[in-house]
Every structure is written in structure tokens, then in C-alpha cells.
Curated annotation (Swiss-Prot):
Any GO CC annotation of this UniProt entry: endoplasmic reticulum
Binding positions for NADP(+) per the UniProt entry: 48-77
Subcellular location: Endoplasmic reticulum membrane
Known EC number: 1.1.1.330, 1.1.1.62
GO molecular function: estradiol 17-beta-dehydrogenase [NAD(P)+] activity; oxidoreductase activity; very-long-chain 3-oxoacyl-CoA reductase activity
Pathway: Lipid metabolism; fatty acid biosynthesis; Steroid biosynthesis; estrogen biosynthesis
Organism: Danio rerio (Zebrafish)
Protein residues bound to substrate: S187
Signal peptide bounds: none
Designated name of the protein: Very-long-chain 3-oxoacyl-CoA reductase-B
Function (record text): Catalyzes the second of the four reactions of the long-chain fatty acids elongation cycle. This endoplasmic reticulum-bound enzymatic process, allows the addition of two carbons to the chain of long- and very long-chain fatty acids/VLCFAs per cycle. This enzyme has a 3-ketoacyl-CoA reductase activity, reducing 3-ketoacyl-CoA to 3-hydroxyacyl-CoA, within each cycle of fatty acid elongation. Thereby, it may participate in the production of VLCFAs of different chain lengths that are involved in multiple biological processes as precursors of membrane lipids and lipid mediators.
Bilayer-crossing regions: 8-28, 125-145, 269-289
Catalytic activity: a very-long-chain (3R)-3-hydroxyacyl-CoA + NADP(+) = a very-long-chain 3-oxoacyl-CoA + NADPH + H(+); 17beta-estradiol + NAD(+) = estrone + NADH + H(+); 17beta-estradiol + NADP(+) = estrone + NADPH + H(+)
UniProt record similarity statement: Belongs to the short-chain dehydrogenases/reductases (SDR) family. 17-beta-HSD 3 subfamily.
């Protein structure tokens, strides 16, 4: 029995040592990311004059445009409605005293990229924020989605094609200059399957994998590419208006997220969201999480349909 007991002792000792080292490293890394941060990286003086933001007139996109302008970047605002673009552009120029440029484009279409390429020609772009996105009006079974064929095309064009094409347009000049940051705003919904939002969740999983793969490809070229995976933020897309500790305003979220750049390839961007991401993706069994998310979706779907029926 002694050899067996000795073996058990060493297995236990190595396990305790590994857990201790792992816990210590997690603590040190957490302090580095969430307390010390890397806020000084995101400056026009170190990356390049211009920051390009898609979906820039509302929510997280607008918050990125404003915060990057505050840090000294000139801003290219890309969104669908010229009137909203002009309004945000004027406000940013007035408040932050930086140059702006607007490009109106409907990312639901695939023929917009020559226009965008022309609008970006000659600009020294230090930052690209691929933020534009679309979700479901309400949770629904895949085959029950109204006009599902059009829905599929629109969501893929906006959530996936925009990220690929905007990266294609901007990345070459970043590589030439050996510096630049690309932030691809995915969603915590891309960390695991979300039944009844299946297509949306899948597009965000694509954005996450695309970002992490490209970061590995171009890190040696001096480029940072980060996958940003927020949980709920008070935006039109989330339909939540009242901020809480775990549901921040876009402004609060963006300020926190920008401090993680260069420290995390894949980031929830905000400490409460990082804790939620760790619990849901690492601690909860997949079957239990799937059951919980499905139940939540069914409840939201029932409330929406009841409200629609009542008129």
C-alpha cells in the first residue's frame, strides 16, 4: 500500500500546487487587467490620427466615437442615416475639437464597400471599431422567424460581412505602418449557444473566432485585434434603459473596455461582465446553461407575443 499511498500523496501535492499557482496567476492577471489597465495605449499620438467606427450614431458605437475623440482621435462615423451622422459629427467636433468625417452606408447591403473604401482613402487609420450589428425583434424558433430568408441575409451581411469587409479595407495600411487596433464588438451571446436567438448567437461566435484567429496572424506585425463580448448594456439593441452595476451605460462600458486592449485578446470588457462570463462559460455545466437560456428565451417570447396580441 505504501507505493500507492505515496502516489496519492504526490498526485494531491501536484494538484494543490497547480491550483495555487493557477489561482495566483488569475489574481495577478485580474489586477493587471481590471485595476491597472492599459488606458494609455489608445491615443492618436501612438496609433494614428483617425479612428473608424461603424454603427456610430447610437449606443456602444456612439460611445466609442465620443471616447476616442476625447482621447484625441479624429473620427470617421459610418452609419445608415445621414441626418443622425451629421448630428453626432457636429456634437463631437464641438465638444472635443477634433476633425470628423461621415459615410452613410446600409450594412444590410453588400455593394457599399467601394463607397466606404473611397471615403477612407488617404487616411492614417489607427483604430477600427467594428460595432454595427442587428439582433432579433424577439426570441423565436428559427423556422418561425417572419420572412426568414431575408432575415438570414440581413443578419449575416450586418453582423459578419461588415466585420470581414471593413477589416479587409483597413488592415493592409495598419500592417504597412506596423501599428493599429481593431475592436470587433461581438456579444456574450457568442460565448455559448443561445436558443431562440440562434442565428444572432452564431454570428457573434463567428466574430469572436475571426478576431482571435486574426490576432494570432497579425500580432507579430504590431497589430492588436480584440474580440469584445459584452453582456447587457443600456442600448436600443438590448431594449434596456435603466443602468445597474451589471448593466452599464454605453459610456461606462466603453471606458472600461478600452483599458483591456493589449491585455486580453478576448474580453468581456467590464469587470462585472467578466465575472458573469467566467461563471456562465467556465463553471456552469453546458446542459444546465442551455436549459436556463432556453427557459429565459421562452419567457421573453411569451411576453412579447402576449403584448402583440393585446395590441
Amino acid at each position: 500500500m505504501e507505493p500507492f499511498a505515496d502516489a496519492l500523496f504526490w498526485v494531491g501535492a501536484v494538484t494543490v500546487l497547480w491550483l495555487s499557482v493557477s489561482s495566483l496567476w488569475s489574481l495577478i492577471n485580474g489586477i493587471r487587467v481590471w485595476i491597472l489597465g492599459n488606458g494609455n495605449l489608445m491615443r492618436a499620438s501612438s496609433l494614428g490620427k483617425w479612428a473608424v467606427v461603424t454603427g456610430a450614431t447610437d449606443g456602444i458605437g456612439k460611445a466609442y466615437a465620443e471616447e476616442l475623440a476625447r482621447r484625441g482621435f479624429a473620427i470617421v462615423l459610418i452609419s445608415r442615416t445621414q441626418e443622425k451622422l451629421d448630428e453626432v459629427s457636429k456634437a463631437i467636433e464641438s465638444k472635443y475639437k477634433v476633425e470628423t468625417k461621415t459615410i452613410s452606408a446600409d450594412f444590410g447591403s453588400v455593394d457599399i464597400y467601394p463607397k466606404i473604401e473611397s471615403g477612407l482613402a488617404g487616411l492614417e487609420i489607427g483604430v477600427l471599431v467594428n460595432n454595427v450589428g442587428v439582433s432579433y425583434s424577439y426570441p423565436e424558433f428559427f423556422l418561425n422567424i417572419p420572412d426568414v430568408d431575408s432575415f438570414i441575409n440581413n443578419m449575416i451581411n450586418i453582423n459578419i460581412m461588415s466585420v470581414c469587409q471593413m477589416t479587409r479595407l483597413v488592415l493592409p495600411r495598419m500592417v504597412d505602418r506596423s501599428k493599429g487596433v481593431i475592436l470587433n464588438v461581438a456579444s456574450a451571446s457568442g460565448m455559448y449557444p443561445v436558443p431562440l436567438l440562434t442565428l444572432y448567437s452564431s454570428t457573434k461566435a463567428f466574430v469572436d473566432f475571426f478576431s482571435r484567429g486574426l490576432d494570432a496572424e497579425y500580432k507579430s506585425k504590431g497589430i492588436i485585434i480584440q474580440s469584445v463580448l459584452p453582456f447587457y448594456v443600456t442600448t436600443k439593441l438590448s431594449k434596456i434603459r435603466k443602468p445597474t452595476l451589471d448593466i452599464p451605460t454605453p459610456e461606462r462600458y466603453v471606458k472600461a473596455q478600452l483599458s483591456t486592449i493589449g491585455l486580453q485578446t478576448q474580453s468581456n470588457g467590464y469587470l462585472p461582465h467578466a465575472i458573469m462570463g467566467w461563471v456562465t462559460a467556465s463553471l456552469l455545466p453546458a446542459k444546465l446553461l442551455n436549459k436556463y437560456v432556453m427557459g429565459m428565451g421562452l419567457s421573453q417570447r411569451a411576453r412579447y407575443l402576449k403584448k402583440q396580441k393585446q395590441g
